[in-house]
Structures are given as C-alpha cells and as structure tokens.
Design a protein with these regions (language model features):
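A translation/RNA-centric and nucleic-acid-associated enzymatic feature enriched
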Residues: 1-107
Length: 107
C-alpha cells in the first residue's frame, strides 16, 4: 500500500485503504481526498516502519491515538482546484489569490 500511514486498511482487502478521491473533469483533477483514519496504535507504528519512517518522529501523532482516539474519518478540499473547475479556468494559477512562482515567493 502506497498511502499515508494514518489511513485505515480495508479489513476484507488489506492491500487497499478506506479512502476516496473526488475527481473534477476538464483536466482539473483531484478536488477532494479523504479516508477513514487508523486508530490502532500498533498498526500505525507498523505502517510508519514499512514506509521507512521513524515512529519517534511522530510521537505527537501517536500520543493523539494513545490518549483518546475514536474511530473517525477526514478529508481535504483543494479550494483553488474547486474554483478552477467551477469557474472553468484554464490554469490553476488563475484561481490562486497570491500565486507563487520560482521567481516570486512573497506576495
């Protein structure tokens, strides 16, 4: 599985994660991505190790699971891509209020 360590795996198909993407047409691509989150601390640690990460670097995250985690899911929405799609803009930079380029990193 080449997914983020915090995504829960499908119990019936462990090679898959319980995740989704909302894809907009017209060449825009992914507008929303989400997943059910893994709550089992040992599964999360194993996933981190499988991805070559040091679990000690994620203690803050592991603590959030260790002390009161509940089953939950989450998602992220790309506002610029959503605006690009709704407004039928040709390029995403036209939807970004303060676009960054290699030559311009400050508004």
């Amino acid at each position: 599985v080449s997914q983020a360590f915090y995504k829960a795996r499908d119990p019936k198909h462990p090679d898959l994660v319980l995740a989704f993407d909302v894809i907009a047409g017209d060449g825009v691509g992914e507008v929303v991505g989400g997943s059910e989150r893994e709550t089992d601390l040992e599964v999360i640690k194993k996933s981190l190790l499988e991805q070559g990460e040091d679990p000690r670097s994620y203690e803050w995250y592991l603590d959030s699971r260790r002390y009161g985690s509940v089953q939950h899911a989450g998602f992220g929405m790309g506002m610029e891509r959503l605006i690009q799609w709704i407004c039928k803009l040709e390029h995403i930079r036209d939807a970004v209020p303060f676009p960054r380029t290699p030559a311009r990193s400050y508004p």
